[in-house]
Amino acid sequence: MNIVEVKNKYCDSTIWNSVSPRKTDVVIASCYKSGTTLTQQIVNLLLNGNSDLRGYKSIHELSPWVEYNPDPTFASLELKLNHIENLPESRFLKTHLPFDALPYNPETKYIYLVRDGRDVALSLYNAGGGYDTSLYEEEKVEETFPEFWDNWLETGRHLWPLWENILSWWRVRHLPNVLLVHYANLIGDKPKEVERMAELLGVKMDAAKKDLVLEESSLEYMTENWEKFQSPGFLPKRFFGKGKNGRWKDLLPQEKIEKYEVFIVDKLGIECANWVKNGGYLPGLIQKALDDAIEEAMTPD
């Protein structure tokens, strides 16, 4: 059962209690706007070896956002739960919940995506221009980004606060079945991140498969095949942004940036805040890479 419950106009965390866990399940998680759909496609390619989506029309049918309710992809919650129950092995399910709002299963593999809050906010702001307002009229964004920023930083508008979500997953980063992935690493060194995901999932990957994963998870491929990946509730071809970080530097005044620097440390603590802002690899992961390098160097040719 969930330790905490999250219920709002988009989500009901208790829906997860109706999903029977499997030993092979994978859960892809983020707060939002942190590379979730990209990671769904990477995991799809690692597990299934192609972009056919096992015959489904979109990644959101093959990898449903479980707690999303009502979900435009499905006619009813009952149909959605039946769909999830009948998904083929290995299932990879999506969530935007904090860790403690999920029913934890030690056999499930969890991948959590993190991104600098300034990039998250700008991506969310830009997404506001792509919503289908017949579904989400109240999410239409009309103010400037600096105006949007002030409200979002404190409240998480239009969705929910980023900080509690990140912190809940940060606290379990040492669990062997939990992998934290920073978006800056994912777009800056995708081959390495793909290898880390493959290792977590127990997927053996030769050069040909790795090339396939990298090619068919590229922004170019996913934009060209947008029908497979566009999230429900967006206008056609309006879901994907530029996929770049740091564009907020030209939009936020210095005083707001300085306030963010203090705010994020207060919310997350120094170590977590530094990682969220800068990316890079966490100490435990760095040590493992070092151990692997030493072992390789000591292995006779």
Q: Residue spans of the language-model regions?
A:
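PAPS-dependent sulfotransferase catalytic domain
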Residues: 1-181, 191, 227, 231-234, ...
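Short acidic/His-enriched helical or mixed secondary-structure segments at domain edges of catalytic enzymes
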Residues: 215-236
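Substrate-binding strand-loop-helix patch
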Residues: 186-188
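Short, well-structured alpha-helical segments
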Residues: 207-214
